[in-house]
Amino acid sequence: KDPETYHSGGPFDPVTGKYLFAGGESYNDIMRDYLLDKMKKDSSVVAINAATPVIVGFTKDKREIAGKQFVDVGIAEETAAAMASGVATYGGKPVWAVFSSFVQRCYDQISQDICINESPVTMLVFAASVKAFKDVTHLGIFDIPMLKNIPNLVYLAPTNAEELLAMTEWSLEQKKHPVAIRVPSVVEHAKGEVAKDYSEIKFLIHPPSLRVFTYYLSSKLTIKEGSDVTG
């Protein structure tokens, strides 16, 4: 009767049939609110997904609000990647939400359709953590080795909600290259300054003692390997 709700499975109340959630903030809801607001202000923003709209909080009522600015291509991540590249090529601002474990399904399209063409696609990678899915077919721990080796792709890893939103905003407004963003699993909020421009990646490290050690390690690696290290 409700295939969308029961697509993913999980603990539920046998009487009501409703899922049992821990409650509290989620990045799904945070990104949903951000994207719906962004869509109202900018008609060129298009959210794309492959049969898992709940990962960005786009339930049926929210999809109706988004209208044509939300596209579900069905269980076909390859199509989602190719469509995102096409939308970006023609001046749109595609936001493609995908589970980490499903990145493998469309590696060719990410590499060739998106990255070779340097299409400014924003790719939100969800459940990319040991804290996410536990079953062997959905482990979210292989996205980094897969994506970091693709030329022309910038892969960002925010540590809190404010960084996630800032990185997404920056990615949508830049037109130079595709950007993937590794959405955290547990909601945290920034305790310090949040950067707005990610064209040159730098680590923001606290406390100062750890910062000194990181700079020291970075300088040693630069000398030993002969290549610059982000610090």
What are these model-derived regions, one by one?
Residues 187-204, 213, 221:
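Aromatic-enriched
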Residues 91, 176, 198-209, 216, ...:
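Long hydrophobic segments that form regular secondary structure
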Residues 148, 224-225:
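Short, flexible turn/loop "capping" segments at secondary-structure junctions
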Residues 1-182, 187-188, 210:
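Thiamine diphosphate
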